[in-house]
Amino acid sequence: MHLLIPAAGSGRRFGADRNKLLLPLLGQPVLAWTLQAADQAQSITWIGIIGQPGDRADIEALVDQLQLATPVSWIQGGRERQESVFNGLRSLPSGAQQVLIHDGARCLATPTLFDRCSAALQTCPAFVAAVPVKDTIKQVAADGTIAATPDRSTLWAAQTPQGFTVESLLRCHRQGLEQQLAVTDDAALLEAFGLPVQIVEGEETNLKVTTPADLAIAELILKQRQFTAAIA
């Protein structure tokens, strides 16, 4: 399975002047945890890291340091995530038919999740890893008043990996760029053009590191995993 990792994370919310994926998390950069999990997954045979020129030297040095068994390629990103993924799709190895897209900031994804997602793509053409929403969600109007309370039983929180056939996702990205359609994840592109996308069970711990609080929570989860592994 081919895996694309968008890795152009801003450090703005951390008060940092560098990519948040290069910030330290329990002794190594955030991105290192993502790469190691993907490398340990039995199904992942190629990894493409999509980033910005200013981060290339640091990320390539990290890849060299990790000595991953899986081949890793650097791919030049675009101005926005959507354009970056499009560049990644066009840079896949010749003959690639299926692809997983995984945010580099979701550094707690496990090898088991990558393998489960790869297996799901063999039976459905497009999917999103997701978990059921636990909180009551309120739809709020522009003036701050509650407009609606959706039925929680129908709501899922989308994560990554998200999986697709290369042909369908590339076609939707081209159409999306032509129509200047802005989306927040790749599945939304397929949805916009009427293509079905299914849900695959994600992981509760598969959070996206966006704020300093997320980084602290991620460290606690990783410490717990290390403790559990040590006493097993």
UniProtKB/Swiss-Prot annotation:
Its EC number is 2.7.7.60. Pfam families: IspD. InterPro entries: IspD (IPR001228), IspD/TarI (IPR034683), IspD/TarI_cytidylyltransf_bact (IPR050088), ISPD_synthase_CS (IPR018294), Nucleotide-diphossugar_trans (IPR029044). GO terms for biological process: isopentenyl diphosphate biosynthetic process, methylerythritol 4-phosphate pathway. The record marks R13, K20 as: Transition state stabilizer. Pathway: Isoprenoid biosynthesis; isopentenyl diphosphate biosynthesis via DXP pathway; isopentenyl diphosphate from 1-deoxy-D-xylulose 5-phosphate: step 2/6. One of its GO terms (molecular function) is 2-C-methyl-D-erythritol 4-phosphate cytidylyltransferase activity. This is 2-C-methyl-D-erythritol 4-phosphate cytidylyltransferase. The gene is ispD.
